[in-house]
A protein has these predicted regions:
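Extracytoplasmic/secreted proteins, especially bacterial periplasmic and envelope-associated proteins
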Residues: 32-39, 43, 85, 89, ...
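Extracellular/periplasmic catalytic domains that process cell-envelope and extracellular macromolecules
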Residues: 10-15, 63-67, 86, 93-95, ...
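Structural recognition of the beta-strand scaffold that forms the well-ordered cores
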Residues: 18-21, 69-73, 99-103, 133-136, ...
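An acidic, glycine-rich "communication" segment
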Residues: 108-217
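Structured segments of extracytoplasmic/periplasmic soluble domains
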Residues: 40-51, 74, 92-96, 124-132
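Surface-exposed patches in mature extracellular/periplasmic domains of secreted proteins
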Residues: 50-59, 102-106, 131-140
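Short alpha-beta junction capping motif
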Residues: 70-119
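Aromatic-Pro/Gly-enriched surface loop or interdomain linker
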Residues: 1-70, 74-77, 196-197, 204-218
Length: 218
């Protein structure tokens, strides 16, 4: 028997813009993800004509991914690796135009990434994905012009590098435009460690739940 809650969640996401996050099994991390995407959804509503629905927490093994334009995936050291079926869903999601924002949440550590438990788990999880060639995000990428990430992509931390799909060699700058045509700037993955959900999270009064803008510590 299908889970009626899951069916209702998928139905709502198919009719309204819904941001989603991967449930890690860590209750605190999952709560921050939900609060962060709720805050981001509220910012979208306040600053644009978009009125997103309540963010959805996704179980990779059970839930459909196709209805969500953006999936936020925070790393924890002990979250399980996806099954082969889940990897197939993830790869199909990226091929169909969806974006996964991988967040190792370790931008407060100098030399973050593979040097941290979260970064090592990120490497293990992404090994089974069809991730394209990546590059450090260029200054003319479309994501540098979005209000919720801004030029230096601050989160709770301000780690130095964000990775996206590498631009094709043929990408050209159009006369009169301040940026190149990077395939509309669409990248199926964005990888960083700035703990974005914590930066977006707000309490009931609209105040930030966490200190933001910290730089890596040696």
């Amino acid at each position: 028997q299908p889970d009626p809650t899951v069916s209702q969640q998928a139905f709502m996401a198919s009719s309204e813009l819904t941001l989603a996050y991967i449930q890690t099994g860590d209750a605190q991390v999952d709560a921050v993800s939900k609060a962060g995407l709720t805050g981001l959804s509220q910012m979208l509503f306040a600053r644009t004509s978009i009125e997103p629905a309540t963010p959805a927490g996704l179980d990779l093994e059970r839930d459909a991914l196709v209805f969500y334009p953006l999936i936020y995936w925070p790393m924890t050291p002990n979250q399980p690796l996806p099954s082969q079926q889940a990897y197939r869903k993830l790869n199909a999601f990226m091929r169909s135009g969806g974006m996964i924002l991988f967040d190792s949440r370790d931008g407060d550590i100098a030399g973050y990434g593979a040097a941290s438990p979260n970064g090592r788990q990120l490497q293990k999880i992404t090994y089974g994905l069809d991730i394209p060639v990546l590059e450090a995000i260029p200054p003319d990428h479309v994501l540098t012009r979005t209000f919720y990430l801004l030029q230096d992509f601050p989160g709770r931390y301000t780690a130095p590098e964000i990775w996206v799909e590498a631009a094709p060699q043929a990408a050209q700058k159009v006369d009169g435009m301040p940026f190149r045509n990077l395939n509309d700037g669409v990248s199926p993955v964005v990888i960083g460690g700035n703990d974005w959900a914590a930066a977006w999270a707000q309490d009931a009064q609209g105040n930030p739940m966490f200190q933001v803008g910290r730089t890596p510590q040696a």
